[in-house]
Amino acid sequence: MEELFRLVRDENDIDKALSMIRSGYMLEPSYKDQYNCSLLFHAVYRKSLELVKTLVGKGFDVDDRLPDGATPLMSAAKNNVIDIAEYLLENRAELDACDEEGWTALMTSASFKHFDMMRFLVEKGANIHARANWGYTVLFYAVIKGSLADVRYLVDKGADANDKNDGDRTVLMDAVTRNDPEMVRFLIERGADVKIRTTENNCCVLGEAARWANAEIVQLLIEHGADVNNVDTMGMTPLLYAATHDNVEAAQMLIENGANLEARERYKGFTPLLYACHLLKPKIIPLLVEKGADLNAKDKKGKTPLGNACKKGGLEIVKYLVEHGAGLQVGKKNVADVVKDKAIKQYLSELP
């Protein structure tokens, strides 16, 4: 068998392998190579329908398994060979078999962006509601890696636009992370709930949007009832997330719709402005200041926005804060007396 494995696996010499088999070479369907892989899997990988047919005709198991539980049909889905997938199914391969991660051939096809294969498997009756480990369905993979047309196809076939995994993370959250307004709009129109929170940390879809999305998506979520002041288990609000990611567009929309400028996260007591200064986020700081954020708010260690910017070495941010009225006192000391950054220290010491 090793000679056949070498021809198929290593040299891709399918014609010679077929010639050997037709000449009476003794096949051992249960034989596995050093990768614990049967010859049938290598035939699928090489996309040779003729060799697959020959091997199945010689007794190879269409539902053979790799060490991770994957089947030949999953391999066909991964390698996007519809003719082989069709042949395997005609020979009673299990359509919804799953590997040790709970993946089916359908999930595999979507995950590898083979959406023609995905449609083929759905038309053959693949279960679009099957769940992998942690509760992911094929719709999650289509939302993450596909187009609106792929997502629409699955929803039209019965996939739940409000689908969520075991931690209550929804497909809508993944669509928001992609920053795709049309996909977000479509899912909402088809029933996605903008108010769902994850069970693990009480995160909401607007919090995702505040980090990754544009103003159009943020506005769309707010229009459909998303809470601009949702607080997760870390005390983070959407505006705090916008501050940590320097997302000015999202922050502008959140503030216009009533986001709390002085909300504080739980661990360090940061407000959006404190967090932005701590992380040196230059774009969002002017917006927060212009909208009235407290320039002299203090975190749990008593540091102000200016103190945080000084500690992190953000000279331009320090200049901006001072020019807009940030206090120079830290308790009984002047911030210039405690700052370590030389450029900032010089700038502060030269102030009138």
Annotate each predicted stretch with a short phrase.
Residues 1-41, 45-46, 53, 57, ...:
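Intrinsically disordered, low-complexity regulatory segments in ankyrin-centric signaling systems
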Residues 1-7, 157, 224, 257, ...:
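Ankyrin-repeat-protein effector appendages
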Residues 7-12, 42-48, 75-81, 108-114, ...:
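Ankyrin repeat A-helix N-terminal signature
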Residues 13-21, 48-56, 81-89, 114-122, ...:
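Ankyrin repeat structural motif
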Residues 27-29, 62, 95, 128, ...:
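Ankyrin-repeat inter-repeat connecting loop/turn
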Residues 31-33, 66, 99, 132, ...:
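Ankyrin repeat boundary/linker residues
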Residues 36, 69, 102, 135, ...:
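Start-of-repeat signature of ankyrin repeats
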Residues 133-136, 141-145, 165-169, 173-178, ...:
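Core solenoid repeat modules with strong leucine/isoleucine-rich periodicity
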